[in-house]
């Protein structure tokens, strides 16, 4: 995979990694989690979601896992995704990079309230 696709990490890919930091999720679950964790500021459509998932899978930042509970409950097999250790490390690095970018805004008192 060409490095340029993940350097810097696109916002959609970062949000997908964050959504998988707590639990394994299927595509629709990732879409809902991204809306929740961004308080509605970001919504991933199916095209963006699945092209980002494909890129993250190819880079081994996430992996596909089976969820037998869905089958037991009579649901169609869904593709679930899990954050890999490399994905967690990249999410941490990206969060630190973003925090560093915001430091001047905090220092200059541009950010207020909950952002400080």
Task: Map each language-model feature to its residues.
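Basic, short loop/linker segments at the boundary and entry of helix-turn-helix/winged-helix-like folds
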Residues: 1-9, 81
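Basic amphipathic alpha-helical segments that dock to polyanions
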Residues: 49-56
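Exposed loop/turn and edge beta-strand positions of beta-sandwich/beta-sheet ligand-binding modules
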Residues: 77
